[in-house]
């Protein structure tokens, strides 16, 4: 019998646009793990899980979402900076909103600059227009490794749930892990180290994160974290953020209440 499966992880930061004639032009930036459900919550009001700032002001359209964040924390930090550009030392060059500038236009201007400065410039993000009729050219344009997409996000692949392991199974798995070695340095790999594996079929690469980072950085001297590189085993191109995200999916993690994280902490102050 096959084991149960769960959807793959999705962390997105989105931009809502208000279509209510009384509030038309208002926008809202938020974090979600499920875009379709999240926009329904916003339109249903705070009692149904929507945010305080959007409750009673709908209908709202989710017009843009960025996804591909390696973790919920990375997405939440991006969300906060997009909401509060004046408080981010990375965005001091952007400048405040102009008196003649629409809120939507201002938020796109902030976003364009965010995608061009550290630490966000090196994330494996996709900029996705859920409403193509709202599309604006970002200036400056996103980095070449960040594609522009249209329409709803593709379904997330199902990841098999790990069955509960007996003590004997756990000991056997630890013993096997102790015998595995890093492709690059030949030292032993332990399960808790979360070795990086090449996603291409048939590629035998298993490496310490530090070892593979150093290998990739040979192609990007002067950088602290790699953006991309070529697999030392199969020679195919790999995005660093995708590798790290896959590593996190394949390891046991602490349970995180993502539903609570979807409502920004500032909304919780409005009681």
From Swiss-Prot:
Q: SUPFAM superfamilies of this UniProt entry?
A: GIY-YIG endonuclease
Q: Per the record, a Pfam family?
A: SLX1_C
Q: Which domain of life is it from?
A: Eukaryota
Alphabetically sorted, this entry's keywords are:
DNA damage, DNA recombination, DNA repair, Endonuclease, Hydrolase, Metal-binding, Nuclease, Nucleus, Zinc, Zinc-finger
Grouped into one coarse class, the protein's main location is nucleus
Coiled-coil segments, which residues?
none
Provide the E.C. number(s) assigned to this enzyme: 3.1.-.-
A single GO CC term, please?
Slx1-Slx4 complex
**SLX1-type zinc finger locations on the chain:** 182-234
Kindly list the places in or outside the cell where this protein is found, as annotated in its UniProt entry: Nucleus
Q: What GO molecular function annotations does the UniProt record carry, in alphabetical order?
A: 5'-flap endonuclease activity; crossover junction DNA endonuclease activity; zinc ion binding
Give residue ranges for domain GIY-YIG. Answer: 9-94
Q: Which cofactor does it need?
A: a divalent metal cation
Q: Where is the signal peptide?
A: none
Any one GO BP annotation for this protein: double-strand break repair via homologous recombination
Kindly indicate whether the keyword Hydrolase belongs to this entry: yes
UniProt similarity note:
Belongs to the SLX1 family.
Assembly and partners are described as: Forms a heterodimer with SLX4.
Job of this protein: Catalytic subunit of the SLX1-SLX4 structure-specific endonuclease that resolves DNA secondary structures generated during DNA repair and recombination. Has endonuclease activity towards branched DNA substrates, introducing single-strand cuts in duplex DNA close to junctions with ss-DNA. Has a preference for 5'-flap structures, and promotes symmetrical cleavage of static and migrating Holliday junctions (HJs). Resolves HJs by generating two pairs of ligatable, nicked duplex products.
PANTHER family hit by this protein: STRUCTURE-SPECIFIC ENDONUCLEASE SUBUNIT SLX1
Its protein name is Structure-specific endonuclease subunit SLX1
